[in-house]
């Protein structure tokens, strides 16, 4: 997954079309999340998907549709070339073994339950305040569009 993440990051910067660049960025976020998940950081992998893929990429596509950028192709890499470059690298990525130190560490707690316990006990007032702010902002956005 690290190899695919590196290639996806290069493609996100190097592709000419903004839409293709966003798709490469989404691929990068998903592969990093899978890498975090398989390394034992389950919560961080899930949060990576929720925050980056769910919010930032969709927001960027929404902004691109509002700006109405005209795309004039000036050459570049054909998608078939990209696929032909990536296919031979897949066996290298599958054969990659995670670091033994990460596998030897065993956790006796569930990090999701710890975060949930902290949110709903110690940080409960802040959670309520954030909920009220979100509701007021949604109502304000609806009121502004009328």
From Swiss-Prot:
TM region positions: 10-30, 43-63, 81-101, 124-144
Keywords: Electron transport, Membrane, Mitochondrion, NAD, Respiratory chain, Translocase, Transmembrane, Transmembrane helix, Transport, Ubiquinone
UniProt-listed InterPro entries: NADH_UbQ/plastoQ_OxRdtase_su6, Nuo/plastoQ_OxRdtase_6_NuoJ
Annotated Pfam families: Oxidored_q3
Membrane topology listed for this record: Multi-pass membrane protein
EC number annotated for this UniProt entry: 7.1.1.2
GO biological process: mitochondrial electron transport, NADH to ubiquinone
Reaction catalysed by this enzyme: a ubiquinone + NADH + 5 H(+)(in) = a ubiquinol + NAD(+) + 4 H(+)(out)
Record keyword Methyltransferase present: no
Compartments where located: Mitochondrion membrane
GO CC annotations, alphabetized: mitochondrial membrane; respiratory chain complex I
Domain of life of the native organism: Eukaryota
Main location: mitochondrion
Alphabetized GO MF terms: NADH dehydrogenase (ubiquinone) activity
Enzyme type, top EC level: translocase
Family statement: Belongs to the complex I subunit 6 family.
Stated role: Core subunit of the mitochondrial membrane respiratory chain NADH dehydrogenase (Complex I) that is believed to belong to the minimal assembly required for catalysis. Complex I functions in the transfer of electrons from NADH to the respiratory chain. The immediate electron acceptor for the enzyme is believed to be ubiquinone.
Name this polypeptide is given: NADH-ubiquinone oxidoreductase chain 6
